Amino acid sequence: ANKAGMVARGYTPGVTGTSALRKLKEAIKAVREGYNGALVCQATPDFIMELELELAGKIMAATFSKGGIQTQVPSVDGVPIISTPSNRMYTVIKINDGKTSGQEKGGYEKGTTAKSLNFFVCPVTTPIAVTKQDIMRIFDPNINQKLNAWQMDYRRFHDLWVLENKPDSVFLNIK
């Protein structure tokens, strides 16, 4: 989202004199200027509610398919809008390692310089989801002290990559 015009700031859903539909259509147009394929929008529940109130019964449903599961979601101009919890829509996150003092809880939290996102629009092919699994440890029933059963332990890590030539295909709308 480094290219000029691919980041919009200062919109708060529900503020008088603003239009959620206009903001979304501007984002879709900006991405379509440089990309011709299918797009997807991830949006906060607040933004989706404002969009639905503006369109009052006129919003179209689209079938979004991922991993063999088909889901009906709202759409604008054929772009499915996926509801994403607000606590996952930040410009920067801090990853807690679970070991360091103050990071024992693990997981992630909002970064100190982070701003909240309303939504982002990108081609479905831009983000590449990667999963990695640590070495699996297998314990037989004689070693497993909790149960008379086999036990397997492993850690799974997830990451989302955007290739160096694709950041300009992502449009961010920041609060």
List each model region and its residues.
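Sequence/fold signature of self-assembling virion shell proteins
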Residues: 5, 9-12, 54-175
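Extended, solvent-exposed, turn-rich assembly/linker loops in the middle of proteins
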Residues: 2-73
